[in-house]
Amino acid sequence: APLAAGLPESIDLYIANRGDKLLGLMPDARRTVFWIHNPARYLMKWRYLSKLWRIKPAIIFIGDYHATTYPALAPSGMRVVIPYGIAPPFSDVGAADEPPPRRAIFTSNPLRSLDWLLDLWRDHIRPNVPDAELHLFCGAATYGSVGAEKAAEMEQVLEHARSMRHEGVVLNAPVAKERLVEEFASARVMLYRGDINETFCLAVGEAQAAGVPAVVQRIGSVVERVIDGQTGTIAGDDQAFAA
């Protein structure tokens, strides 16, 4: 373990990641930074607030929306937004010579509005584009132990997807990044509604880096991944999303 030999006596910069037990480990650090990833509401507990008030670390958020999840009056030092980077394979996709086939792609958590998307696809999108396909790359395996806890709930949504194979829905298991890059190169659009608990959305970020236009709604952090009218569409409602 990196800290098996103990902590240094002093350090210029100490970065504590997520947990409250890490915050006070380096009291003599010249500067302490607290890097968080999930919606910041979990910080509104005494075990966090007491340490944040005493240490007042700079808090690193991964997006502007993420920063809004921590109240303005709650204790902190500086509040800084540093978005995640995107893995190089996704930005290495070259421009296509011709438009890809009428294939939409979804690569996020099936519990994040996939049921909604399937219904919208069946009722509004596919009837207007009968030869279109919706390719799904998702499942519990992506999320490790957290996914295992939600596997039964996810399976209900995935079964819904399987039942729509005659309506152009193609369900695939999660794939490695190298394969996903290839799938993005064959997709015309990424369809993803967004989720209030999402603070960055790597799924849309990866698709955008690979040059895939995205259609999203004004929910959570996805609006920070898409430039409306340039790299995709930020739809105001379900009707605009389906159009």
Segments (PLM) and residue ranges:
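Donor nucleotide-sugar binding/catalytic pocket of nucleotide-sugar-dependent glycosyltransferases
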Residues: 56-71, 75-92
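C-terminal "capping" alpha-helix adjacent to the active site of nucleotide-linked donor transferases
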Residues: 233, 237-243
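Short acidic/histidine- and often glycine-rich active-site loop of Leloir-type glycosyltransferases
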Residues: 219-229, 233-234
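Short glycine/serine-rich donor-binding loops of glycosyltransferases
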Residues: 201-204, 222
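Conserved catalytic-core segment of nucleotide-activated headgroup transferases in glycan assembly
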Residues: 88, 96-163, 171-174
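Short alpha-helical donor nucleotide-sugar binding micro-motif in glycosyltransferases
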Residues: 174-177, 182-187
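Extended catalytic core of nucleotide-activated donor transferases of GT-like folds
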Residues: 2-57, 64-65
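Acidic donor-binding loop of glycosyltransferase active sites
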Residues: 185-199, 212
